[in-house]
């Protein structure tokens, strides 16, 4: 297998939780707990990509590999591409985007998404999904849904409830009749060569409608492998309520790094 580089994009200026990467989680900044999780994967290198020297300073005592990147990247994917270019990675090197607000991420999921991409040489990206078990989640536009083909490749990602159950939703919109619905998990593995091409493309029409970056790759004909997550994927930290929940789980020992 090619080398695997995990990149953790960490922006200081989160709109809902300013300074989110440095929020305290029982004596450690959130970004440190994410980094510790990533280091337990089989990756050959873990890099924190940040736009702020405060994050770099906070991670120095840990001996973390931190790269200061441009402050004006429109997305985490663009930040990944900068890291891949500066590291002069081989085109076949697998680069994993681990969100900087997921301090409970199981390292096994990082390894799973890497294997999925390594096993399909025709794919440029691999990601994960998990079953949706309730109507509220299915119809929530903040939850991204994905539809796959027979080979596990993505057919489409949407904020809408896809696929649409024409028969049952007309009579029982409060009931899921099958297990056809999948929630996308935002953990990605890319080939470094793909990242170099991606940042030169303009946003695609469907990407702009749905506000989903991965649709840009599909617009240009790139395949995305989607594996069913081998274990539960704990939600990240987007709100004060999420922060309280994660702190409680860590206190109870469920979030041990």
Swiss-Prot record:
Its EC number is 2.7.7.38. GO terms for molecular function: 3-deoxy-manno-octulosonate cytidylyltransferase activity. Keywords: Cytoplasm, Lipopolysaccharide biosynthesis, Nucleotidyltransferase, Transferase. The keyword Nucleotidyltransferase applies. GO terms for cellular component: cytosol. It is an enzyme of class 2 (transferase). Its main location: cytoplasm. GO terms for biological process: CMP-keto-3-deoxy-D-manno-octulosonic acid biosynthetic process; lipopolysaccharide biosynthetic process. It is found in: Cytoplasm. Pathway: Nucleotide-sugar biosynthesis; CMP-3-deoxy-D-manno-octulosonate biosynthesis; CMP-3-deoxy-D-manno-octulosonate from 3-deoxy-D-manno-octulosonate and CTP: step 1/1; Bacterial outer membrane biogenesis; lipopolysaccharide biosynthesis. Belongs to the KdsB family. Activates KDO (a required 8-carbon sugar) for incorporation into bacterial lipopolysaccharide in Gram-negative bacteria. This is 3-deoxy-manno-octulosonate cytidylyltransferase. It comes from Chromohalobacter salexigens (strain ATCC BAA-138 / DSM 3043 / CIP 106854 / NCIMB 13768 / 1H11).
């Amino acid at each position: 297998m090619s080398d695997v580089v995990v990149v953790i994009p960490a922006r200081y200026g989160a709109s809902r939780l300013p300074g989110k990467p440095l929020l305290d989680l029982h004596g450690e900044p959130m970004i440190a707990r994410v980094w510790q999780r990533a280091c337990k994967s089989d990756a050959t290198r873990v890099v924190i990509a940040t736009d702020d020297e405060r994050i770099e300073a906070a991670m120095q005592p840990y001996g973390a590999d931190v790269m200061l990147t441009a402050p004006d990247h429109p997305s985490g994917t663009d930040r990944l591409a900068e890291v891949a270019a500066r590291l002069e990675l081989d085109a076949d090197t697998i680069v994993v985007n681990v969100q900087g607000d997921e301090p409970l991420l199981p390292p096994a999921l990082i390894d799973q998404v890497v294997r999925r991409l390594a096993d399909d040489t025709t794919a440029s990206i691999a990601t994960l999904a998990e079953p949706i078990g309730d109507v509220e989640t299915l119809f929530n536009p903040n939850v991204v849904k994905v539809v796959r083909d027979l080979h596990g490749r993505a057919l489409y990602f949407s904020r809408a409830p896809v696929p649409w159950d024409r028969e049952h939703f007309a009579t029982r919109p409060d009931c899921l009749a099958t297990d056809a619905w999948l929630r996308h998990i935002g953990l990605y593995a890319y080939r470094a060569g793909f990242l170099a091409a991606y940042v030169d493309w303009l946003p695609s029409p469907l990407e702009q409608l749905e506000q989903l970056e991965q649709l840009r790759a599909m617009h240009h004909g790139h395949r995305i492998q989607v594996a069913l997550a081998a274990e539960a994927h704990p939600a990240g930290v987007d709100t004060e309520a999420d922060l309280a929940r994660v702190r409680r789980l860590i206190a109870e020992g469920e979030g041990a790094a």
